[in-house]
Amino acid sequence: MSQSKPGLQGDGKSGQGSSQSALTLAALGVVFGDIGTSPLYAFKEAFTGTHGLAVGPENVLAALSALLWAVIVIVAIKYVWVVLSHDNDGEGGVLALTALAHRVMGDQSRRSRFVVAAGVFAAALFYGDAIITPAISVLSAVEGMSIATPEFEHFIVPITIGILIGLFSIQMKGTSVVGKLFGPVTIVWFLCIAWAGVASIVQTPMVLQAVNPLHALRFAVQHTDKAFFLLSAVFLAMTGAEALYADMGHFGSRAVRLGWYGLVFPALMLNYFGQGALLLRDASAASNPFFLLAAPSWLLVFVVLATAATVIASQATISGAYSMTLQASRLGYLPRVRVLHTSDQEQGQIYIPSVNWLMLLAVIALVLAFKSSGALAAAYGIAVSGTMLITTMLVGFVVYLGRSRARGLTLSALACFALLEIGFFASNLTKLEQGGWLPLTLGAIIFIALMTWRDGTQLVAEHRRRLDIPMSDLMSSPMSGVPVVSGTAVYLTSDPKLVPNALFHNLKHFKVMHEQTVFLHVINENTPYVHEGERLRLKPMCNGVWALDMHFGFREQPDIPAALKRLTPDADGEIPNLDPMTTSFFVARVQVVDGPGGLSAWRCALFGWMSRQSASAATYYKLPANQVVELGTQVVL
């Protein structure tokens, strides 16, 4: 039940949406910001971190070689080539991948439940990273001002907070507008860091020896302990890789690949090698090799450009968080959220106000608590390395069960990726005491919330199945004594086999039935989009009563009135009269009450709070306010 998203991927020849070049430009401004600013701190961390190496030719070449080949294997091959090829009908991100793996495995297997839990935990870790990225990225750039003008040091935190407030405030304009604004700046950024790298490499060409992977392998064999700690610094060069996959739904895999291979990867490597060449000439430059790479007359220009680039880096994780939240809500791991579509052409470009402002508050709290990028560096990496490892596992399940032609080769490659990522994750765990606890704690809290919502909604459904009246009993019972009023009643139901609570209360309190009744069941599919021809299924139940199934993909905004306009007659050639003047929509709002069994008291309280934050069914499904009747019901968990 899937279809391609119009105007998103730019792979076709039609004019639906932006051209491929415009999509690639926008992708540069949104997708690559995070990984594109890693030169600000990644290579420096190898020599100035808690377990920093001594600056010398052997160590510099080994660190560069390890960084180069790690980026090639994990980002250029695994993500840009392998992972982007395993999308969920054009949609990326770990939750979309989890839904795909779940669909391939089936609902009932124990292995399937494990995969779903792992995928949800990876999504929770991604949220932790999405909160840390804006804080560390903008801080690292603004700190460059203290190199140019030491008096600026006391203003680093206030300036950082001001920049972050501005960034989150323009999100309502949409990722398309933001991307078009940031895209040209990102191109200038990559060209400038590449130019600075080339200028340094020309002065010390021996740095090119690091292209040989033997430098990294020899260092790993001779200095195993140091190599293990080096992995956590090298990993910082790849922290934006997951955003490439998470944001794929905004711009399509082709735009991501063109941007990576055409500009981003060459520019990053030239700059890293330029920093390495600088350290070979001047060991004292290890304190901040990125900014010291620039000529003194260009330092302020680089600081301003780096600040702009780190704002863009934050955009990658912000837009990724929007996508993740929408998917989590559609797949049943979060309550209904208010989603604004910011483009008439690009369906994947969205803005979620609640997520936007919660992230801003969390990011500001981190900046005030840690105050420097160096303090946050230890916290950076654990969440992403865990998400990467789970992504590899999920792709492995999809490939194994999907039985593709290149299954053996792909699984072998994924096994190699997993071994390397286990090393990265283990190395990052050494930073737990220095701040690594933060993303794991954030991830655990979000994971508990996601699983609590899922478990709570399942318990509510079980409660209904246990206590509610089966629909078959209603259809078989005589209704001749019930007064009939004119008009059409549309009852929203979460389980078509049971009588909707709203109808039960309507009969109990008002003791009437409508002339025509429609039981509407909205089904969220595990695919991003649904063909219009497969969206509606109308089935007659008895005279004047219909069951209507309405299908939406997890990336679509459900719009019941718009979908009903496309309703066609049932098998008997009949169709309910849905005239707005005579049609009413009946919805039930559930109030959760703590009771014995089911969820623990604190999880029940959490579920109740999340339920109260949920957008109303009328707002969520875009029902006309003057046609909605809402009836409340209590559920004891």
Protein language model features and the residues they cover:
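The structured alpha-helical core of multi-pass membrane proteins
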Residues: 1-637
